[in-house]
């Protein structure tokens, strides 16, 4: 995903978590809604005055989001483009700006109750206000109007294959890992996303041309003049997974060192959003030997059994000045079997 205004661009992976078909199938004026899971620190870059309350009040530097694109590594010939590139990262601008469907926040009561096992954490040493709870997880709602050429191509080539895969898997929560907390450290993990790396892979940008607002409540995008362009040498999102730096091999390897942790005890990550201090609560997964660069945010993390474990949200750099680094990746776990009020240290 790419969100941009007149000053900056924000990249992050978004993966299809749900969708909603139009009530009237043959009425092209009704949108097909996509729901993309991502990190909250990516979703906060979305500044849409027509967003759902209270998210319509969010703004970074009073700059409104004017461009939203979805991209995928795919064969550009599917889009009938005259190019010698056989495979490229194809980015398509949607006809409207998305909205915020869900944010994981305020799920822990601030009152100190007798049976509350994690006491509220203060926002900072010099701030007496208690921080509210949050997880680095959000869902963005993207409307696709199928009479629009660009939206239709996103649906046909990006989303329809993903929906077909979900349906083949049975649309079940069985595709998510669901196991005791202590057992996660015995698995291997892979990041499925588009981290930014220096690459000579071609990037094709398909942009809206002369598109007007489809509905009054949707925000029209700033359209580019050129319908598409090819860029061979720039920092772009591309496919990758974690690789051990201590092993000299060209083959990617899943991380084999991991451990579950309590957000309030291990990293104590804090944030501020909509004028409110937030403290990360709940359980996460730490993965050793990731060494992933920027842009890994929101990547889907699976185990060796091809089950969804969680969503990648941060990298902790352990040896920034050393040639061999051992960065730790932090993953927000989505499902696990509870084991009481504390983590099993074993």
UniProtKB/Swiss-Prot annotation:
Name the InterPro entries for this protein: Mycoplasma_peptidase_DUF31, Uncharacterised_MG067
Identification of the protein by name: Uncharacterized protein MPN_577
Q: Which Pfam families match?
A: Mycop_pep_DUF31
Family (UniProt): Belongs to the MG067/MG068/MG395 family.
Domain of life, per UniProt, equals Bacteria
- Which taxonomic lineage does the organism of this UniProt entry have? Bacteria, Bacillati, Mycoplasmatota, Mycoplasmoidales, Mycoplasmoidaceae
């Amino acid at each position: 995903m790419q969100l941009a205004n007149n000053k900056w661009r924000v990249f992050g992976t978004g993966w299809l978590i749900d969708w909603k078909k139009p009530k009237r199938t043959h009425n092209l004026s009704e949108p097909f809604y996509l729901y993309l899971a991502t990190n909250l620190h990516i979703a906060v870059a979305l500044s849409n005055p027509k967003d759902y309350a209270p998210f319509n009040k969010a703004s970074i530097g009073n700059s409104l989001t004017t461009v939203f694109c979805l991209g995928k590594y795919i064969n550009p010939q599917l889009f009938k483009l005259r190019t010698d590139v056989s495979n490229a990262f194809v980015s398509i601008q949607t006809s409207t700006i998305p909205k915020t469907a869900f944010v994981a926040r305020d799920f822990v009561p601030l009152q100190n109750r007798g049976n509350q096992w994690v006491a509220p954490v203060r926002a900072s040493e010099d701030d007496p206000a208690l921080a509210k709870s949050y997880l680095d997880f959000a869902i963005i709602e993207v409307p696709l109007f199928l009479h629009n050429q660009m939206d239709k191509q996103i649906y046909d080539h990006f989303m329809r294959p993903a929906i077909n895969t979900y349906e083949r898997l049975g649309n079940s929560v069985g595709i998510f890992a669901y196991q005791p907390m202590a057992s996660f450290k015995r698995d291997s993990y892979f990041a499925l996303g588009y981290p930014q790396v220096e690459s000579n892979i071609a990037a094709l940008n398909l942009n809206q041309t002369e598109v007007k607002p489809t509905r009054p409540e949707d925000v029209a995008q700033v359209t580019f003049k050129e319908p598409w362009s090819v860029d061979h040498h720039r920092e772009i999102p591309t496919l990758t997974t974690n690789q051990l730096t201590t092993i000299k091999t060209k083959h990617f390897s899943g991380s084999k060192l991991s451990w579950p942790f309590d957000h309030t005890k291990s990293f104590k990550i804090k944030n501020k959003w909509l004028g409110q201090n937030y403290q990360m609560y709940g359980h996460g997964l730490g993965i050793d030997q990731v060494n992933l660069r920027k842009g890994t945010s929101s990547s889907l993390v699976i185990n060796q059994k091809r089950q969804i474990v969680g969503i990648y949200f941060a990298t902790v750099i352990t040896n920034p000045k050393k040639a061999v680094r051992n960065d730790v990746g932090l993953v927000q776990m989505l499902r696990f079997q509870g084991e009481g009020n504390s983590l099993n240290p074993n």
